[in-house]
Amino acid sequence: MLSATATPDVISDVKQAIGLDNVTVVSDQFDRPNLKFEVHEKSKESAKEIISILSSGESGLVYCSTKRECEETSALLEAAGISSQAYHAEISKTVKESLQQQWSLGTIKILCCTSAFGMAINKPNVRVVFFHSLPASLEELFQGWGRAGRDGQPAFCYLYFSYSDRIFHIRNISDQANYDAEARTTAVKRFQKVMEFVLISSCRRIFLLSYFNPQEANLTSCNNCDICELRPFTSIPQSVDFTVKVQQIVDSIQQVVDKPFTIKYLAQVVSGKNNKKIKENGHDTLPAFGILKCTTKKCELFLMYILTKDILREVSPPRGSANSSFLQVSLGSQYMQYVTGQTKLMYQSL
């Protein structure tokens, strides 16, 4: 078996599945020091930033979640004078082969593609790989980024995302008819790791190495990611024990099971917003009301971090139901660990 992104847990599962205990595992290093990692929340300036980066004329890939995103992104690049084409599952085999060849030869500089592209492709001089939205897993991210800089020369790996990308992935997991409960939970937890990756305030390379091969995660910093690059100019956030706050949030969620919250609404509650809707619903009397003295945006990021620990979990309401376009907050599989105090939640000071 060959894999570029097998975690220790996956390797253990494979060994168990094939029923062989005496298996030799040969692994190369995961760390690719020539790759620089950057993660950015999308803003009004993101399109200009992406165009500026890709206008160098170097070979690159832009990974997108959907056919529409591929086509719209490619059109945006073409309009800016950048040689680009869209590549996705719905184009014919003949066209796919033609696009692969043109991109490999350098006739096309940028392919805007879904994960349908990339298998068995080995182009050494790819200088930049973008993810234009959140991937479904760190495996998908690392596989895509890993196509950059295979010649050993410096290359750049970017993830541009919106927090609303969560809706696409959670709904997609919910809609998978061939998933049983275990497969659905596994998919959710893999996506939670992606969310944790974008939310961290520590070295991104160390985080990825800790996930894929902990034996390599013995760095203090990599000096080649956006976090480490800013470290000399920013103070290291102090970690604070938020376990009691988490317990109050869980208590509040348990009290409103008949009318689930969204993360945005819950952020308003915990930040103490005294608006009409919160008052009418009586949510200004919940244990979590006003427990965090910071902006609603910071509260929302804190709640998203709680999601990555599976204390809370976002679920997709049935299609066609009221508010079916929003994700609802429910309790995750780990909430009791924090309610009983067996596990503490440490988070940067707000």
For the regions a protein language model found, what residue spans apply to each?
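Helicase motor core with emphasis on the C-terminal RecA-like subdomain
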Residues: 1-181, 189, 217-218
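Short linear capping/connector segments at secondary-structure termini
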Residues: 31-33, 174, 211-213, 231, ...
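Short helix-to-turn junction characteristic of helix-turn-helix DNA-binding domains
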Residues: 103, 198, 253-257
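C-terminal or mid-to-C-terminal helical accessory/interaction module adjacent to the motor/catalytic core
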Residues: 155-157, 165-223, 232, 236
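Accessory DNA-binding and partner-docking regions appended to nucleic-acid-acting proteins
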Residues: 186-187, 217-350
